């Protein structure tokens, strides 16, 4: 990559991502997909320092640095033939991918995971609400805690679905704008998240390290947070975080898909 002082900000971000995530290509494989509570895979020497530098660069990034004009909100409903989310590909190596997701008004990227991956998300315009979660697994080859027989949900689950329910934890739910620092995920912390556009369109830069690769155990899985049936007299503590939740893996929703669109910003060179 060019090393002159006139390099664009996105070029410097890509260069720093190369340093931060070098050697991360290849991941940890499918057998580690559910190891959300185990020790984190060892990273290259200097990883914390390089990650801090990358976070600092991302914090500076704005939509105009990528020649992206903020989309305007519309009161018209989204036509059913248009994707709710689009993606601008910027750059990718075996170690990381770099691109921009653009969400239309009132749309969401459903709850999903990032097996064995680090991620960094920096809002470029608009506001997004990010709910961060993790699966709670026993580790050591043991099965995760089973769903108590008396636990019921609304709507009710089928017997096969009950067998697939897994415990999880909702760690945080916060809103991010272009003035916010990046949202960070690791293989074992905040690895699942849902992203909602709040009061209008939004866009964010996304770094995933290493990129998704189903052949190497890094496929994207979607989840639903189950709503437990609570006694009427039970006090609600839904706002208390972190809190335990029950998760059910689901197929990708029919009303969610993502299509590509051209990236208008400065080119990133190897």
Curated annotation (Swiss-Prot):
Keywords: Dioxygenase, Iron, Metal-binding, Oxidoreductase, Thioether bond
Cross-link 3'-(S-cysteinyl)-tyrosine (Cys-Tyr) per UniProt, renumbered positions: 220-223
GO biological process: cellular response to hypoxia
Catalytic activity: cysteamine + O2 = hypotaurine + H(+); N-terminal L-cysteinyl-[protein] + O2 = N-terminal S-hydroxy-S-oxy-L-cysteinyl-[protein] + H(+)
Outcome of substituting residue 87 to A: Moderate reduction in enzyme activity
Region (Disordered): 21-48, 140-164
Gene3D superfamilies in the cross-refs: Jelly Rolls
EC number: 1.13.11.19
GO MF annotation list: cysteamine dioxygenase activity; iron ion binding
Consequence recorded when altering residue 222 to A/F: Significant reduction in enzyme activity
Keyword Protease: no
Keyword S-adenosyl-L-methionine: no
Domain of life: Eukaryota
Named cofactor requirement(s): Fe cation
Positions bound to Fe cation: 112, 114, 193
InterPro entries from the UniProt entry: PCO/ADO, RmlC-like_jellyroll, RmlC_Cupin_sf
Disulphide bonds in the chain: none
PANTHER family named among the record's database cross-references: 2-AMINOETHANETHIOL DIOXYGENASE
Function: Plays a vital role in regulating thiol metabolism and preserving oxygen homeostasis by oxidizing the sulfur of cysteamine and N-terminal cysteine-containing proteins to their corresponding sulfinic acids using O2 as a cosubstrate. Catalyzes the oxidation of cysteamine (2-aminoethanethiol) to hypotaurine. Catalyzes the oxidation of regulators of G-protein signaling 4 (RGS4) and 5 (RGS5) and interleukin-32 (IL32).
Protein name: 2-aminoethanethiol dioxygenase
Gene: ADO
């Amino acid at each position: 990559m060019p090393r002159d002082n006139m390099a664009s900000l996105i070029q410097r971000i890509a260069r720093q991502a190369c340093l931060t995530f070098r050697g991360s290509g290849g991941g940890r494989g499918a057998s580690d997909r559910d190891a959300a509570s185990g020790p984190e895979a060892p990273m290259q020497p200097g990883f914390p320092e390089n990650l801090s530098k990358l976070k600092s660069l991302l914090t500076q990034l704005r939509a105009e640095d990528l020649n992206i004009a903020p989309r305007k909100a519309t009161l018209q409903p989204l036509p059913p033939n248009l994707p709710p989310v689009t993606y601008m590909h910027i750059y990718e190596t075996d170690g990381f991918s770099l691109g921009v997701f653009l969400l239309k008004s009132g749309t969401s990227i459903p709850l999903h995971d990032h097996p064995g991956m680090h991620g960094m998300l920096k809002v470029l315009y608009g506001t997004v609400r990010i709910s961060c979660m993790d699966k709670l697994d026993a580790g050591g080859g043991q099965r995760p805690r089973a769903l108590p027989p008396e636990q019921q949900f609304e709507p009710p689950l089928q017997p096969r679905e009950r067998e697939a329910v897994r415990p999880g934890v909702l760690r945080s739910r916060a809103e991010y704008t272009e003035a916010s620092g990046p949202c960070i995920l690791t293989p074992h912390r905040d690895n699942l998240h849902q992203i909602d556009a709040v009061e209008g369109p939004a866009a964010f830069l996304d770094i995933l390290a290493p990129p998704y690769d189903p052949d190497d155990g890094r496929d994207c899985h979607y989840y639903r947070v189950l709503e437990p049936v609570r006694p009427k007299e039970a006090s609600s503590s839904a706002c208390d975080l972190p809190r335990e939740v029950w998760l059910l893996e689901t197929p990708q929703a029919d009303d969610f898909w993502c299509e590509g669109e051209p990236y208008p910003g400065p080119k990133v060179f190897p």
